[in-house]
Amino acid sequence: MESEYREMLLLTGLDHITEEELKRFKYFALTEFQIARSTLDVADRTELADHLIQSAGAASAVTKAINIFQKLNYMHIANALEEKKKEAERKLMTNTKKRGTQKVENRSQAENCSAASATRSDNDFKEQAATEVCPQAKPQKKQMVAEQEAIREDLQKDPLVVTVLKAINPFECETQEGRQEIFHATVATETDFFFVKVLNAQFKDKFIPKRTIKISNYLWHSNFMEVTSSSVVVDVESNHEVPNNVVKRARETPRISKLKIQPCGTIVNGLFKVQKITEEKDRVLYGIHDKTGTMEVLVLGNPSKTKCEEGDKIRLTFFEVSKNGVKIQLKSGPCSFFKVIKAAKPKTDMKSVE
């Protein structure tokens, strides 16, 4: 839901006011939100939306923004935002009811299965026990099982038409199904872009840049799509066009100052310059920087065969925002991809030897 509120706050609200109106909005935001004036003054529209949500929470930020637009007598924006918010809340209520009904049905099925299992033979029982003890028996796997159940609730059967912007080559990694080849892609609709984790390398011939495809039976997480072997991906003939501003946002490397205010779990792709490297036995800590600040990137395992040096750049794919104590950092996961881009060596004048 947070992504929906962020989208409506930006696209339905802040993007529809002029620079002068934005200054007035920021003036009233000082009293509505606990944000420093210095932070508000330099924030662009996207950063402002992030600051508002970080300060008040997603739903509350939209409500407060509506109040400000009403004070400024920008009623067309206030009304549009209010309608979008009600629509999102209705959708949430509908999904909650559906999930509640599904849970009751699942509980009933589980009780029936439990009663039926009492009549199973010893051999059947042993076979089932052997299956259940397998990797999930480890304590650290319990959370993974819970996450799998949560993922199933977000199965999207309705097709989504998107245009492929980018796809990397398949690589091997550990997944819940074991070691397999996967790849990552970026796709877009006419209003937004999404990162996609594709758990079946056979779909690679569908994810060709500029091609329009239809995806169904996929999993939707809070900030990315997951395409599995059960998903359906087909080519479609469509006049589907992605606006330049959406393409630009999809290709941009997020600024470090913006990453530091993102919630944990946010997926990050981008190219960053390295200024410090700390190597340990099973991990490497990279210090990255840009014009807006510095940050650390924690890469677990052996990230790359190419040795990284200060001044090189690292391309991160499917990394996550995480916390190390109070410090915000980027962290690799089981399906992250890491690549070193060597810095160009300065050209030196060739001296002749006589």
Curated annotation (Swiss-Prot):
PANTHER family: INTERFERON-INDUCIBLE PROTEIN AIM2 (PTHR12200:SF17), INTERFERON-INDUCIBLE PROTEIN AIM2 FAMILY MEMBER (PTHR12200). Degraded via selective autophagy following interaction with TRIM11. Disruption phenotype: Mice display defects in neuronal morphology and changes in behavior, characterized by lower locomotor activity, anxiety and reduced auditory fear memory. Mice are protected from pyroptosis of intestinal epithelial cells caused by acute ionizing and subsequent intestinal damage: in contrast to wild-type mice, crypts of Aim2-deficient mice maintain their integrity. Mice develop more tumors in the colon in the azoxymethane and dextran sulfate sodium model of colorectal cancer. Induction: By TGF-beta. The lineage of its organism: Eukaryota, Metazoa, Chordata, Craniata, Vertebrata. GO terms for molecular function: cysteine-type endopeptidase activator activity; double-stranded DNA binding; identical protein binding; pattern recognition receptor activity; signaling adaptor activity. Residues 1-87 form the Pyrin domain. Residues 95-124 are annotated as: Disordered. GO terms for cellular component: AIM2 inflammasome complex; cytoplasm; cytosol; mitochondrion; nucleoplasm; nucleus; site of double-strand break. The pyrin domain mediates homotypic interaction with PYCARD/ASC. The HIN-200 domain mediates dsDNA binding via electrostatic interactions. Sensor component of the AIM2 inflammasome, which mediates inflammasome activation in response to the presence of double-stranded DNA (dsDNA) in the cytosol, leading to subsequent pyroptosis. Inflammasomes are supramolecular complexes that assemble in the cytosol in response to pathogens and other damage-associated signals and play critical roles in innate immunity and inflammation. Acts as a recognition receptor (PRR): specifically recognizes and binds dsDNA in the cytosol, and mediates the formation of the inflammasome polymeric complex composed of AIM2, CASP1 and PYCARD/ASC. Also acts as a tumor suppressor independently of its role in inflammatory response. Able to suppress overt cell proliferation in enterocytes: restricts stem cell proliferation in the intestinal mucosa in an inflammasome-independent manner, contributing to a decrease in the likelihood of colorectal cancer development. AIM2 suppresses cell proliferation by inhibiting phosphorylation of AKT1 at 'Ser-473', preventing AKT1 activation and AKT-mTOR signaling pathway. InterPro entries: DAPIN (IPR004020), DEATH-like_dom_sf (IPR011029), HIN-200 (IPR040205), HIN200/IF120x (IPR004021), NA-bd_OB-fold (IPR012340). Self-associates; forms homooligomers in response to cytosolic double-stranded DNA (dsDNA) and the dsDNA seems to serve as oligomerization platform. Component of AIM2 inflammasome, which consists of a signal sensor component (AIM2), an adapter (PYCARD/ASC), which recruits an effector pro-inflammatory caspase (CASP1). Interacts (via pyrin domain) with PYCARD/ASC (via pyrin domain); interaction is direct. Component of the AIM2 PANoptosome complex, a multiprotein complex that drives inflammatory cell death (PANoptosis). Interacts with EIF2AK2/PKR. Interacts with MAPRE1. Gene3D superfamilies: Death Domain, Fas, Nucleic acid-binding proteins. This is Interferon-inducible protein AIM2. PROSITE patterns: DAPIN, HIN_200. Inactive in absence of double-stranded DNA (dsDNA). Homooligomerizes upon binding to dsDNA, dsDNA serving as an oligomerization platform. AIM2 requires large dsDNA to generate a structural template that couples dsDNA ligand-binding and homooligomerization. Homooligomerization is followed by recruitment of PYCARD/ASC to initiate speck formation (nucleation). AIM2 and PYCARD/ASC homooligomer filaments assemble bidirectionally and the recognition between AIM2 and PYCARD/ASC oligomers occurs in a head-to-tail manner. GO terms for biological process: activation of innate immune response; AIM2 inflammasome complex assembly; brain development; cellular response to interferon-beta; cellular response to xenobiotic stimulus; defense response to virus; DNA damage response; innate immune response. Disulfide bonds: none annotated. The keyword DNA-binding applies. Residues 144-341 form the HIN-200 domain. The keyword Hydrolase does not apply. Expressed in developing neurons. Highly expressed in regulatory T-cells (Treg). Belongs to the HIN-200 family. Keywords: Cytoplasm, DNA damage, DNA-binding, Immunity, Inflammasome, Inflammatory response, Innate immunity, Nucleus, Tumor suppressor. Its main location: cytoplasm.
